[in-house]
């Protein structure tokens, strides 16, 4: 019991340090965050403009709401992942990665604390980006009337994203400069978010993976919450429990794979040199 209390206390100290670290980062480099949101905002607007020019009068046939929600979620996944693997890449260059690896805490604990510390900022970024599209695109059927369910789904979804981030961080430990490769994967997630579930055949492996992947489960829930055409929210306790369990299992799998890759990196001496 004492050991558990000590572990929780130590983890809270790490979390406090990471929150302070993130605050200092925001205070010193505010333009980096602002410019990231701005350029992410501009990119999708350019996509819509391109569609409107190529198919005059047919842009309304697009499911703009689903595209925008999926795109904002992709930004949420991207910023979360970069907070883990991107920082490992930077620390391997500055020499601070070795200090983390020989501290009294495991790298996995430090990364988890870092992810939790940055999560409020990333949720705010999601809201800001979605709100910008809401006010700049006419007749957009997106509503913020159910913020409790929005936040609940994003928090549960974040657990699954942490699993993805652990895997990306482990690959970064082994190969270091892999940022461009991960950006391609993040845009592949965008394809998943934009996928029409009705076009997948029930009972197939692809459909089963789509229905149980935490990121696509979160996307499906957010569509029901945010898009006005869904008048009633029909979330059963069983559905939310399945969503939570799947996210936890994915996070545990990601943590396990990260530990394997961290041990391999230690064996190869990759934590002490770039």
Which sequence ranges carry the predicted segments?
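Hydrophobic transmembrane alpha-helices and immediately adjacent juxtamembrane helices
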Residues: 1-274
């Amino acid at each position: 019991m004492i050991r558990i209390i000590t572990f929780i206390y130590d983890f809270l100290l790490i979390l406090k340090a990471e929150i302070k670290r993130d605050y200092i980062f925001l205070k010193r480099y505010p333009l980096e965050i602002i410019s990231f949101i701005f350029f992410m905002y501009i990119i999708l607007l350019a996509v819509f403009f391109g569609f409107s020019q190529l198919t005059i009068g047919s842009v309304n046939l697009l499911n703009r709401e689903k595209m925008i929600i999926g795109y904002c979620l992709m930004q949420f996944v991207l910023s979360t992942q970069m907070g883990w693997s991107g920082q490992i890449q930077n620390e391997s260059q500055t020499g601070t990665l070795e200090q983390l690896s020989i501290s009294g805490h495991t790298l996995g604990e430090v990364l988890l604390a870092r992810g939790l510390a940055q999560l409020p900022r990333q949720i705010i970024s999601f809201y800001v980006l979605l709100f910008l599209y809401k006010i700049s695109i006419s007749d957009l059927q997106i509503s913020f009337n159910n913020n409790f369910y929005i936040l609940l789904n994003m928090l549960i979804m974040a657990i699954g994203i942490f699993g993805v981030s652990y895997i990306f961080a482990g690959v970064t430990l082994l190969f270091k400069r892999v940022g461009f490769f991960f950006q391609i994967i993040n845009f592949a997630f965008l394809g998943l978010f934009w996928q029409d579930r009705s076009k997948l055949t029930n009972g197939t492996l692809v459909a089963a993976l789509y229905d149980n992947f935490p990121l696509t489960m979160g996307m499906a829930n957010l569509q029901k919450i945010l898009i006005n055409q869904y008048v009633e929210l029909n979330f059963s306790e069983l559905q939310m429990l399945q969503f939570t369990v799947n996210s936890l299992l994915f996070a545990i799998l990601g943590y396990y794979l990260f530990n394997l890759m961290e041990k391999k990196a230690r064996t190869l001496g990759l934590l002490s040199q770039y």
